[in-house]
Swiss-Prot record:
The lineage of its organism: Eukaryota, Metazoa, Chordata, Craniata, Vertebrata. GO terms for cellular component: membrane; mitochondrial outer membrane; mitochondrion. Plays a role in erythroid differentiation. Involved in cell proliferation and tumor cell growth suppression. Involved in the metabolic reprogramming of cancer cells in a PDK4-dependent manner. It comes from the Eukaryota. Belongs to the FAM210 family. This is Protein FAM210B, mitochondrial. GO terms for biological process: cellular response to estradiol stimulus; erythrocyte differentiation; erythrocyte maturation; inflammatory response; positive regulation of erythrocyte differentiation; reactive oxygen species metabolic process; skin development; spleen development. Expressed in late erythroblast differentiation stages. It is a multi-pass membrane protein.
Length: 190
């Protein structure tokens, strides 16, 4: 019952929480007060401050524009960025290295798909097995198209994979080149 009361915020709506529902139950050390039922047993008339801490507002007031990240940490006013926004951020942060890496990954991807398509492998069956919609695959594999156009269409279908590879690999490559001494370390902001 107390867990349900803690889960339900004011006015009975389900509230979003950034910490475990019942840290007192798990035995973790927190600065929170015990749940409502424990307050009712210990204090004949709990004051508003005790009720607020029992409701879950003891660590901090949750701002409406704060969002939890998968790792559990919270970004201030920053929302989760889309892949293209993350790619633009990498381009701004790493400059020519990020752009060069992404272009290189794209050219390698296009070359691989061109080789696969020109070798005669039925790519429509492979794409359907990978979970692409049949209408999308058939529109990309129109009859009478050249090998390069089909390879380019498949290359475009795999854009999220290329962007993910770029987002993961660019920081590692830059960090390696900085440790070797090919790149200067980033300038510290005053």
């Amino acid at each position: 019952m107390a867990g349900l009361l803690t889960l339900l915020g004011p006015a009975g709506r389900v509230s979003t929480r950034l910490r475990p529902l019942a840290p007192w139950l798990l035995g973790t050390a927190t600065s929170c007060a015990p749940p409502l039922w424990a307050l009712a047993l210990s204090h004949p008339v709990p004051d508003a401050r005790l009720l607020r801490t029992a409701r879950g507002d003891c660590l901090s007031r949750q701002e409406p524009n704060r969002t939890p990240e998968p790792g559990g940490s919270v970004t201030g006013t920053e929302k989760k960025l889309s892949r293209t926004q993350q790619l633009k951020k990498v381009f701004q942060e790493y400059g020519a290295v990020g752009v060069s890496m992404h272009i290189g990954i794209s050219l390698v991807s296009l070359g691989i798909f061109y080789t696969v398509v020109s070798s005669g492998i039925d790519m429509s069956a492979i794409l359907l097995k990978l979970g692409f919609k049949e209408s999308l695959v058939q529109s990309k594999m129109a009859a009478g198209t050249s090998t390069f156009v089909v390879a380019y269409a498949i290359h475009k279908l795999f854009a999220p994979v290329r962007i993910s590879i770029t987002l993961v690999s660019v920081p590692f490559v830059v960090r390696y080149f900085r440790s070797v001494g090919l790149f200067k370390p980033p300038a510290t902001k005053p």
